[in-house]
Amino acid sequence: MARIDLDHIRHSYFPHPTADEHWALKEVHHQWEDGGAYALLGPSGCGKTTLLNIISGLLIPSEGRILFDGKDVTALETRDRNIAQVFQFPVIYDTMTVYDNLAFPLRNRGVPEAEVDKKVRETLEMIDLADW
């Protein structure tokens, strides 16, 4: 995936929002490019979690569209979006090996398996876990 576009996204947990304060997420129109490092910052209750849930497919926005590399994925289910979130405190999947934990984000991005293997082995060397 090369780009995520938020095309005039808004969300309300009210069935028929009529006032400005009914919107959990005010209109967002933004683009993220592949390879960038981004932080989503703001005070409690400003809509950060709502936005992440919309991008990942856990919520469908009340208004607007989400595009992954130009493709409208607004109505796609979470499993069909091929996206994962990396949180401030990353999770290690205890049902996966160290190798598979390192390979997981690369595979989610559709990196060819030969390149996944190369990058994972390089990373294991860097952190002195190649023998494990």
Regions found by a protein language model. Name each.
Residues 64-71:
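Conserved ABC transporter NBD signature motif
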Residues 96-104:
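Short coil-to-helix segment of the ABC ATPase nucleotide-binding domain corresponding to the Q-loop/switch region
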